[in-house]
Amino acid sequence: MKRRSCLKILLATTGMVATRAANGPVAAAADGQHPIELHLDLAVDPVKEAEMLRVFEKEFKPAASRQPGFIAIKMLKLSSTLRGPAPAGCNYQFVLSFASEDLRQKWVATPIHKATWPKIESTFTSPNYSRLLYEVY
């Protein structure tokens, strides 16, 4: 086989592996459960924004990432509205992905979650935020 052909195959294979790793698992587990994503639309007080991000990055995210079934976690800051209205007063969206809702609930029941989530929640201007749970296909 020619060197150029080998390099093309190697690069294509590496790209496929990287894409799969970045996207995470989306197939149903052996028990038939699909991964889940939890979306929260949050109104974070601008004065407390730095504190919220510090707790999220230094405490909450590392603790969540060590849990069984953890897939991904993101804190998204709204930068612009392209079409349709944004949720009223919300400037952040929290997205958490787990292999199943059962595993997410086990994480919610841990002492570290019970200690760190209230720190994040205390930075909100309102305790009334949307909680949307999605199955991932």
Residue spans of the language-model regions?
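Short, well-ordered beta-strand segments in beta-rich or mixed alpha/beta enzyme
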Residues: 35-43, 75-110
